Amino acid sequence: LLLVRNNTSAQVGDKEYTPRELMEIFFKKLLGFTAAYTGGMELAAIAMTLKSIEPDTCNLLREAGSSAAGSQCEIFFMSHQDCFFQYILHQPEEMWTQNVLLYDYQKDGIHSYELQMNRNSRPVVCLIEEENFPQMKMTDVSQMSDAQKQAFFTQLDNAFLEIVRNYCDGKFVSSAFLLGDHFTRDWCKDSLRYLCKGRRVFQGNNLFSKGACYGAREKVLPSTLSTTYVYLSDECLHANIGMNCNRGKEETY
């Protein structure tokens, strides 16, 4: 993906491949793997999730994907926020009766996402607030002594505990999701214990990819969820526009 963004060719053996050629090879191999699960059925759509949606990158990926899968296959691009929204919406409703938190642990620290729903609006308007915590950047502990590791992990645990406590105190949170290999039991002790009090907590790495699949299905085969809940991203107008109308003798909104 870095080659695609930089529009840089790559040398493989004696041949030089353009970014589009490399992605086309990738898509063909990927489709070969999925053939065992689809039983030879044609794919209706391919969904890709990217941290940032860049037009040039998306255009190249769309061309490569369409060339590999065929023009009948729709190509969708979804942000991590949209994938988070779609994933949560397709979970049991008791998991999102209140706000939902997601902590994504990357190399540069923790990125948090908070899903909020305004259930007084029709359709239900959903917003996602984001925040970055660079102070949680993971350090290489391979050269540390056991005592140094313990001290570092304790400091990390206390820092994350402060982050979740500052948010959760006085608020209603139904569930929280921890993404990334850096969330381990080596350090995530007091913070995890606090987070699990009265909330459902899950850990994994494939939430965004699953959310992309749910989102693609909603675009191809819309369910009632698509009309009942609307996610307002940064590209959308953050306002509800409504008016009172007369239906017979009754006034409705």
Regions found by a protein language model. Give the residues of each.
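Gly/Thr-rich phosphate-binding beta-strand-loop-beta motif of the actin/hexokinase/Hsp70
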Residues: L1-N6, I88-E130, N244
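Conserved phosphate-binding catalytic cores of ATP/NTP-utilizing and phosphoryl-transfer enzymes
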Residues: G70-Y103, L207-L225
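Conserved phosphate-binding loops in N-terminal lobes of ATP-dependent enzymes
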Residues: L1-L50, E54, E129-N166, V173
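Glycine-rich phosphate-binding loops at beta-strand->alpha-helix junctions
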Residues: I46-C58, F160-L195, R200-N205, K210
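Early-domain small/polar-rich strand-loop-helix modules and first-structured segments
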Residues: L1-G13, S66, E74-Q86
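Alpha-helical scaffold elements adjacent to nucleotide-binding pockets in ATP/GTP-utilizing enzyme cores
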Residues: F26, L60-S67, S191, G211, ...
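Acidic, glycine/GT-rich loop-and beta-edge segments that sit at the periphery of enzyme/chaperone cores
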Residues: L207, Y214-Y253
